[in-house]
């Protein structure tokens, strides 16, 4: 009798909770498929490096190279100056992105709404906006250095001028796409400008605004990495990669690229989560 009860308890302990089982059933394809894809890519990369098909260090070098292994497992050290762990370099880059991207979001949304509401402004400035958005981030670096004579504000300007255009253009398009029926109802109800803005314009244009914001966060992250590479003495992941290249630390470069990709992915997922959260409230 005791044995039967014990056996039943053991089976109950081995049975996963229904919540976990249901979550795994619903999400396993989304987890297993990427793992196979990433694993296959890493295996191909390591084999290519081991067979001498590429001079790029394989992923195993992150663990076999002592210097890179220390950087991987100890990202928080600070020996002063530019000799910092990767986490601190990443925080330096992200602080610049936060400033430049926030300015781009504020200005881009405000100007985009104005342009979307006013056809004369749209006709006057759309060619200029389309022209400026084609300029590559690196092309803005020397202009920013001439303007500000200092790396920090110059880097923030490069982020701002690179990331503002998707926000501005998508916001303007979202405002232009507000159905005419909504505008007519607002006129019939004699809605105030404030009510029209909060109850009609913003909810209607929000998907377009977030499309611009999501595109721009990626551009902002790419821009700061490029700017840090060519701005000497500026702590950040871009500087870390360039310094590793100059000293022929190939595995350090690989580690830096992994950090860049991981942070970029996190920023994109955060923006997607924020979009779903705010859109559901509207």
Please name every model-derived segment:
Residues 99-129:
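Transmembrane-helix boundary motif in ABC transporter permease subunits
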Residues 176, 211-214, 254-282:
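C-terminal transmembrane helix and the adjacent membrane-cytosol boundary/short C-terminal tail
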Residues 157, 161, 193-225, 255, ...:
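Transmembrane alpha-helices
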Residues 19-23, 50-102:
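Periplasmic/extracellular loop-to-transmembrane helix junction in inner-membrane transport proteins
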Residues 1-39, 269-282:
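Transmembrane alpha-helical segments of polytopic membrane transport and secretion proteins
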Residues 130-166, 173-174:
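Generic hydrophobic transmembrane alpha-helix motif, especially the helices
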Residues 25-28, 87-95, 99, 122, ...:
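Alpha-helical membrane-interface segments at transmembrane helix boundaries
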Residues 167-209, 241:
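Short cytoplasmic-facing helical segments at TM-TM junctions of multi-pass membrane proteins
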